[in-house]
Regions:
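Conserved ABC ATPase signature
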Residues: 139-143
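H-loop/switch region of ABC-family ATPase nucleotide-binding domains
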Residues: 199-200
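Conserved ABC transporter NBD signature motif
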Residues: 62-73, 81
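The feature captures the beta-strand-to-loop junction immediately N-terminal to the Walker
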Residues: 39-41
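Helix-to-loop junction immediately C-terminal to a conserved catalytic motif
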Residues: 54
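Conserved ABC ATPase "signature" C-loop
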Residues: 217-218
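Catalytic Walker B motif of ABC-type/P-loop ATPase nucleotide-binding domains
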Residues: 164-167
Length: 279
């Protein structure tokens, strides 16, 4: 039986003064334990959805549910939601508010009024896990973009959320930084955290995710396993999405070659090249 950590039931939201709703009846469920990619054109509602997911915004109509229970506007409910659902913004500058790396990572814990010794130990472990120990006392404004992204992620993960939301986390990172960031995400997921990542990178989404959501005009239009979602050429063409390069290459191969390459679709062009090399 599939369990869902977070659900949206007919959620509507319109920004003040906007002619069109940002969310126009979104109904979707985030399956527990998955690596989910959230895809959609700019302005489709991805970031607004995330702001509802951890209680920063409240729906004008509809409900957000955590593990099947509707989230009320009670302060205690919203605080519990923020602990359970961690959100990392696209721009780390919006998230990093303290002077030093260690102070920033400890900020959320301090708001929980935990004992100082417990806070110090949690921060120490988190800085170590994210490779930030040597920068503990470094002013945040001295860091590179990639380092700031790591600090923002560490500041969320120190709270030990069950669900991690990432808004375009690999944008403006070079390939080495992206690879390091993805390795960090693999460790987080392996420890039991469900992840939802908003991204425009369809090749990355296909290779990394095991569940895909597609939004358009404030609605959910597709959801499912990557192979099924990216097989829907009709919808992808309307949204002007290019299919992942590895799928286009795979489909260009003669049938007898594909048969010899073994079962299952390759996830990356590198994997496809390796299979071809071994023929």
């Amino acid at each position: 039986v599939t369990t869902h950590v977070l659900e949206f039931a007919d959620v509507h939201y319109t920004y003040p003064g906007a002619a069109q709703p940002a969310l126009n009846g979104v109904t979707m469920a985030v399956p527990a334990g998955r690596r989910c990619a959230l895809l959609g054109r700019n302005g489709c509602g991805k970031s607004t959805l995330f702001l509802h997911a951890n209680g920063i915004f409240r729906p004008h109509k509809g409900q957000v549910l955590w593990k099947g229970v509707p989230i009320s506007s009670r302060r205690a409910d919203l605080q519990a939601l923020k602990r359970n659902v961690g959100l990392v913004f696209q721009d780390p500058e919006q998230q990093l508010i303290a002077a030093t790396v260690a102070e920033d990572v400890s900020y959320g814990l301090c708001n929980l009024h935990l004992p100082e010794a417990e806070i110090r130990e949690k921060v120490r472990r988190t800085l170590e896990a994210f490779g930030l120990s040597e920068w503990a006392d470094t002013p945040v404004h001295h860091l590179s973009l990639g380092q700031k992204r790591r600090v923002a992620l560490a500041g969320v993960m120190v709270m030990e959320p069950e669900l991690l939301l990432l808004d375009e986390p690999t944008s403006y990172l070079d390939p080495w930084q992206t690879e390091a960031f993805v390795r960090q995400l693999e460790r987080i997921h392996a420890a039991g955290t469900t992840i939802v990542m908003a991204t425009h990178d369809l090749d990355f989404a296909y290779a990394w995710a095991d569940w895909v959501f597609v939004m358009d005009a404030g609605r959910l239009v597709l959801a499912g396993e990557p192979e099924r979602v990216f097989a829907r050429r009709d919808i992808l063409e309307v949204l002007q999405f290019k299919r992942p390069a590895v799928l286009e290459l795979w489909e260009s191969l003669p049938g007898h070659v594909k048969e010899r390459l073994g079962p299952g679709l390759p996830k990356t062009t590198g994997e496809l090249a390796e299979r071809l090399r071994l023929l």
